[in-house]
């Protein structure tokens, strides 16, 4: 038996179909729009994606470099370990001493040392924090007052006139690269001389004396002699500063020269003496500590 719909039913079905078809069409349109928007966005993102890929490539290379560095020597981790060890083993057990040092310093010694990493004055001579005011430069040179201001003589002025140190030590050492540069440098100063060459030429007088006295020796032996002569010259140059010379005359400041031999861990020492009659100064009292 055939089943037929009434007029009202046909109208409802027809309306429903139209509604469904309209919804379907709208959904299709929305999907198409979204696809077009997505496509446009993707096109806009292409350069950004390319940059990201390039950046990732750079990051990968950087990470590879980091991995190589970390496997060889992780500097920051090592420094962190050493600092915390210092705090745990030295700072905390003597915290009152370090709190006092945080307020002020009153060192009795001024050291002019070489910048060489193998020769730390505090390590070699056993100075504790607050005991020695230290300045280091290439070849531990002290220039005379007429040469003008340097970081070394400015530190000297502060140590002597403000901190009122009682001893000044010029500390040199064997196998000094600065003195080797001085000895190997030609006696004329070229226009393109490096900063190191120009600085070490402040020791030229010691070089010339060494060449005159030991020209028959090997280059290395001449360097050893020049290292000591340079220390003596720096000691004498200290007297060109009136605020040092006057204190030495009054016995308030003593000046010493030290030569540390890296090969056998010996220390050769001199002292600056003065002639009371005419206020002349000379190097004396040579000692060797070994």
From Swiss-Prot:
Residues 1-20 form a transit peptide. GO terms for molecular function: carbonate dehydratase activity; zinc ion binding. It is found in: Mitochondrion. The modification S-nitrosocysteine is found at residue 226. Keywords: Lyase, Mitochondrion, Phosphoprotein, S-nitrosylation, Transit peptide, Zinc. Reversible hydration of carbon dioxide. This is Beta carbonic anhydrase 6, mitochondrial. Belongs to the beta-class carbonic anhydrase family. Disulfide bonds: none annotated. Strongly expressed in aerial tissues including leaves, stems, flowers and siliques, and, to a lower extent, in roots. Accumulates in guard cells. GO terms for cellular component: mitochondrion. One of its GO terms (biological process) is carbon utilization. It is an enzyme of class 4 (lyase).
